[in-house]
Structures are given as structure tokens and as C-alpha cells.
Amino acid sequence: MKKIYIASDHAGYSLKSYIFEKLKKKFDIMDLGTNKKSISVNYPEYAHKLSKMVSKKKSNVGILVCGSGLGMSMAANRHKKIRAALCYSIKNAKLSRLHNDANVITLGERLTDKSLAMKCVNAFLNTDFEGGRHLKRVKGI
């Protein structure tokens, strides 16, 4: 069973909490913070924390949320073995797994409503890497 890690900064706290509540009954999921919306925090701290956990085991995946999803994506992608994808549609959430073997999805609370974000997360979690011609490309990342 895959382990899911989830984290956010203050700007992504509400969406992170919503996603966590929706997933906790069905998945082994760990919330790595932040735990307060009212206190401003630095998103790289949470992206690095989650990336370290996800990179420990191939089956681990992560969900990162900030205001736009961009900062979390950039910070997470600095880590070896992390392929973080900023997702804003169901199609690109699926393709991030299918073609790019993404192991972290990043979302922007200010840009993505809860319903679409949840659909993206479900697509991400329920899509496997296709391999084949994409394997060589992913190895080149």
C-alpha cells in the first residue's frame, strides 16, 4: 500500500486540510504541516520535509499545497528522486503519472477550487506509470 504525505504552507492550509480529511479514511496518509493558517511560514521548509519522506521509498507519494503550487513544485524538484508536478486539470494530473512518473502533486489553493483539486488528487493517486518509451525519458530527468 502506498504511503501518502501531505504538507502545505499557510496559503495552502485550507485546501490541504480538506484533502487530508477526504483521504484519511481510505489511505495511509501523514500530515506534515503546517498546522495553522494564521501563522505565515516558508513553503520550502514543508516541500523539503515532504520530499525527504517521499524519496525514502518508491511507492511513497506526496501532495503539496501553497498559494499557486509553483513554489512548492520548484522546491520539491530540487530533491533527488522527486518528480513534482503542478496540476491544474484532471488530464495533466493523469499525464504526470502516466508519462512522467510524478511522485508528488502540487496544487495552488488560490487558483484551484476544492472540487477540481480533489479530482486532480484522485486522478494522480489512481494512475500508474505507463513505462515503455517514457521510462528512458524519465531516467533523463
Where do the language-model regions lie?
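Short active-site oxyanion
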Residues: 3-4, 59-62, 81-83
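C-terminal binding/interaction regions
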Residues: 5-7, 11-12, 90-141
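Glycine-rich phosphate/diphosphate-binding loop of Rossmann-like nucleotide-binding domains
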Residues: 6-24
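Short helix-loop-beta junction
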Residues: 21-29, 81
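A short beta-strand-loop structural module common to alpha/beta enzyme folds
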Residues: 28-40
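Short, structured active-site "lid" loops
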Residues: 46-64, 68
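Mid-chain, well-packed structural core segment of small domains
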Residues: 64-106, 110
